[in-house]
Amino acid sequence: RSADMHFSSIELYNYGIYKGLHKIDLVDRIDKKNITLIGGMNGRGKTTILDSILLCLYGRKSAEYITGKKEAYSKLLRDHINKSAVDKSTHIKLTFQMDDDEDTVLSVNRLWNQSGNKIDTTLIVEKNGIADLYLSENWEYYVEELIPFGIAKFFFFDNEKISQIADDDAFDKIKDSIKSVMGVTTI
C-alpha cells in the first residue's frame, strides 16, 4: 500500500526575494482540503515558493526545470540567495505528513552557504523530529519512490510553466512517469 503525503509547512530563509525567515503553514485545519492555491500580484514570490518546493525535494535534478535551461546547480543556488541579506546562508525546509501506519512526519531541509565563489550544500532529513542519516544520504532515491520527478512538475506549477507541460514532446514523458508511479514497467 502506498502512503499519501500531505505538506504541512514550508520554511524559507534568505531564499530568493524572501529575506530572513518566512514560514508558510499549508495545513487547512478547518475544511481539511488537499489543494493549496497561492495567489498574489506579479513579482511577489509565488513562483519562488513553487520552485523552492521542487528544489528542496529534488535538488540538482530540479535545476533545468526551474531555470528553463541547462544550468549548473551551484549557479541556481547562488542566484537564489537573497541579495540584500548580510548572511549568505540559505535554506528551504519542507515538512509533510505521511498517511502511513505510523503517521510519519518528514522534514527535508536543504541548506547552502556561499563562501567566496564556493557553494557548500547540506541535506538533512528528519523523521518524526529526529535527523535520519540513512534518509539524508539516500533521499534522491526515496523521493523518487514517493513522487517521481517526472510527474512532480504536474503537481507544482504556475501559469509560466503550463506551456512547458503542454508541449507535445512531453506526452511520452508523462506516460512513463504515470507508469512509474503505478509500478508498471514495459518489457
Locations of regions flagged by a protein language model:
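Pre-Walker A-like glycine/lysine-rich segment at the N-terminus of P-loop NTPase domains
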Residues: S2-Y58, I178
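Residue-level recognition of well-ordered beta-strand positions that form the cores
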Residues: E11, K93-Q97, N109-L111
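A generic structural motif
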Residues: Y13-Y15, T95-D99, D103, I124-E126
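Conserved NTP-handling cores and scaffolds of large molecular machines
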Residues: I53, L57-K61, I147-I151, V181-T186
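Glycine-rich phosphate-binding loops of NTPases
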Residues: E64-R78, E102-F154, D167-D176
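Extended, Lys/Glu-rich alpha-helical coiled-coil stalks
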Residues: N159-I187
